[in-house]
Design a protein with these regions (language model features):
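Conserved glycine-rich
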Residues: 140-141
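Glycine-rich ATP-lid/hinge loop adjacent to the conserved G-boxes
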Residues: 109-122
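Short alpha-helical Gxxx[C/S/T] motif in the catalytic ATP-binding
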Residues: 128, 132
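Short conserved segment of the HATPase_c
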Residues: 96-109
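Acidic ATP/Mg2+-coordinating residue in the GHKL
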Residues: 91
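Short helix-loop "hinge" at the ATP-lid/N-box region of the Bergerat-fold HATPase_c
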Residues: 64-65
Length: 170
């Protein structure tokens, strides 16, 4: 079992959310259907590895588009609590069943929605959300999913403002 590690030392981590703008442009350009992004950022940075956070968001956006209805709406928001930067990615897609929500971050797991979408050209091995989970854990954060089948899926990421490795810098 390989453990995921961040590429950079904790002191070097500060991710500006410009990465979100780049990703939304990229996905709008390559999507096979209309995609509308609603961006609402109360906080502009996260204590995270820029490259890896970009990969996490890319993964979540890609899934939102893959497993969506004809017209895709994705909202990305950020806020800060006392201890965390909270990042949310929500879509108006096909949703994920309660049973699948319990296992969705496990390696090689694919939601029933994903299996059904294979007929529509969605591909992959079920590694994406496991990777997302590993990255967030490597940043001492947490990720949760909330979804209603046929309506929406929302991923909420909590990234600590302070970790044991960066306390002395604040």
């Amino acid at each position: 079992e390989r453990t995921f590690r961040r590429k950079k030392d904790a002191e070097e981590l500060s991710c500006g959310f410009e990465v979100i703008e780049k990703l939304t442009e990229k996905f709008k350009a390559k999507a096979q259907k209309p995609v509308n992004f609603i961006i609402s950022l109360q906080t502009k940075t996260a204590y995270a590895d820029n490259d890896y956070l970009g990969e996490v968001l890319s993964n979540l956006i890609d899934n939102a588009i893959k497993y969506s209805k004809e017209s895709v709406e994705i909202s990305i928001s950020s806020e800060e609590s006392e201890r965390y930067t909270i990042l949310k990615v929500r879509d108006n897609g096909l949703g994920i069943s309660e049973a699948d929500q319990k296992v969705i971050f496990q390696k090689y797991e694919r939601a029933a929605t994903a299996k059904r979408s294979r007929k529509n050209g969605a591909s992959g091995f079920g590694l994406g959300l496991n990777f997302v989970d590993q990255v967030i854990k490597a940043h001492e954060g947490r990720i949760f999913v909330n979804s209603t089948e046929g309506e929406f899926t929302e991923f909420t990421i909590y990234l600590p403002l302070e970790t044991p490795n960066n306390r002395h810098n604040r």
